[in-house]
Design a protein with these regions (language model features):
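Long, contiguous internal "core" modules enriched in hydrophobic/ aromatic residues
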Residues: 1-155
Length: 156
């Protein structure tokens, strides 16, 4: 069963099942009343997973096959405390993955290590590229996004 097939299977589930999954994951009901954010997460993650599986190294977000649902973006912005999350930059995927890892019970320490590893790689990139190109790849909010994400982990 591929992640895309799993997403399609989840899409076919009735609303009660989707709401039940959201409740298990402790997603806020005011931002996920119909349980659709888990589905949006699955399909957003699918593109990243496929890019990694087929291309190995991910440099930017050209792997996206569709638009990320605004409800998922709103959920992440409000829950994590980061404004203007944009899935044209890798930070958005790191934010989304970290958020859902915490919701699924991953430890704070493991999430901090995940972010630290990502930051280390982006620092290598920053040292090797002119700042204008670096900002085109990661956006100008990278540092503030990562600080806010670390703050979210500490509080969650």
């Amino acid at each position: 069963l591929t992640l895309g097939e799993f997403g399609t299977l989840y899409d076919c589930a009735c609303t009660n099942v989707k709401v039940y999954v959201s409740r298990i994951m402790k997603l806020p009901t005011n931002l996920d009343s119909d349980g659709m954010n888990t589905q949006f997460f699955i399909f957003t993650l699918k593109d990243l997973r496929n890019a990694i599986a087929h291309n190995n190294v991910i440099f930017d977000t050209r792997f996206k096959t569709g638009k990320t649902d605004q409800r998922l973006v709103t959920l992440l912005e409000r829950e994590v405390g980061i404004s203007n999350i944009d899935f044209k930059y890798m930070d958005a995927y790191i934010i989304m993955i970290t958020y859902f890892l915490r919701k699924m019970g991953e430890t704070k320490n493991a999430c901090k290590q995940f972010i630290s590893s990502y930051q280390q790689q982006t620092e290598f990139l920053r040292n090797d590229l002119p700042i204008s190109i670096y900002n085109q790849i990661l956006g100008t909010q990278h540092k503030s996004n990562m600080l806010a994400l670390q703050n979210f982990i500490s509080k969650s």
